[in-house]
């Protein structure tokens, strides 16, 4: 895929190089550097992968997406594109790379402090009984048409998420059902995905602290973001936080 096509929908500035490059894959782990790949530099909680840009180019990477300035003299020959949020750009580019598979399935997202896993399994069972072919992503892994794969996070990183959607679609799934965590929303793992149905189970003080959410109000606000990207919302009206969340 041409770099310019990969960047469809992404706001960027071309700092160096050409958009006519052929890109075979996207990486955000510097250890996977290879010719034909684009490296997305992400500012993490433990380290800043902009520090590995030169190493990646030396390993053959042909394009870089950066969130802040880097020393261009250390990345000769590579295309360099600057964006406001590299995580957001990773999500949109990953969707483009895999043909935006979520647009060709019914998308259902479930959020809440407790009950996400149970709820998704129940929904999956009901839909399958009705004849739907369902792919499911969540805390217990990925399930589709008799297959099971482990996952590192409740809501996987955007690249893995889009790759999984592609696998669902290629296998014949017509519905993608997933747990949507507040971290997944905050870290743009689900950026670019529109849900046909969003489901809210409940909310209680949890995931508050270093590396997660600073306050309960922030946590609630991120949970509510799911309902800004869905067509229909199904909520627990008995939860005292529902009105504020919406």
Where are the language model's segments positioned?
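P-loop NTPase switch/communication element
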Residues: 140-160, 164
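Residue-level signal for inorganic ion chemistry
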Residues: 6, 37, 56, 93, ...
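Short loop/helix-cap segments at secondary-structure boundaries that form the rim of catalytic
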Residues: 33-34, 68-78, 143-145, 188-194, ...
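Acidic, Mg2+-coordinating active-site environments of NTP-dependent enzymes
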Residues: 7-9, 70-77, 171, 197-246
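Switch II (G3) loop of P-loop NTPases
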Residues: 173-183
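N-terminal leader/targeting and accessory segments in enzymes
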Residues: 1-92, 228
């Amino acid at each position: 895929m041409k770099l310019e096509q990969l960047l469809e929908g992404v706001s960027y500035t071309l700092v160096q190089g050409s958009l006519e490059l052929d890109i075979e894959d996207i990486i955000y782990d510097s250890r996977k550097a290879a010719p034909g790949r684009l490296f997305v530099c992400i500012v993490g909680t433990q380290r800043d992968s902009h520090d590995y840009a030169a190493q990646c180019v030396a390993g053959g990477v042909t394009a870089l997406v950066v969130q802040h300035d880097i020393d261009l003299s250390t990345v000769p020959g590579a295309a360099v594109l600057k964006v406001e949020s590299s995580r957001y750009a990773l999500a949109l580019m990953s969707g483009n790379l895999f043909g935006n598979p979520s647009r060709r399935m019914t998308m259902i997202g479930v959020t809440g402090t407790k009950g996400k896993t149970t709820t998704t399994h129940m929904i999956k069972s009901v839909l399958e009984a009705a004849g739907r072919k369902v792919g499911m992503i969540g805390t217990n892994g990925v399930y589709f048409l008799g297959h099971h794969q482990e996952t590192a996070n409740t809501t996987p990183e955007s690249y893995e998420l889009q790759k999984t959607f592609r696998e669902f679609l290629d296998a014949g799934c017509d519905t993608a059902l997933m747990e949507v965590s507040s971290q997944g929303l905050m870290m743009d793992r689900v950026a670019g995905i529109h849900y046909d149905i969003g489901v809210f189970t409940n909310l209680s003080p949890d995931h508050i602290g270093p590396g997660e959410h600073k306050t309960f109000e922030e946590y609630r606000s991120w949970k509510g973001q799911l309902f800004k990207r869905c067509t229909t919302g199904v909520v627990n009206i008995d939860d005292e936080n529902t009105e504020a969340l919406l």
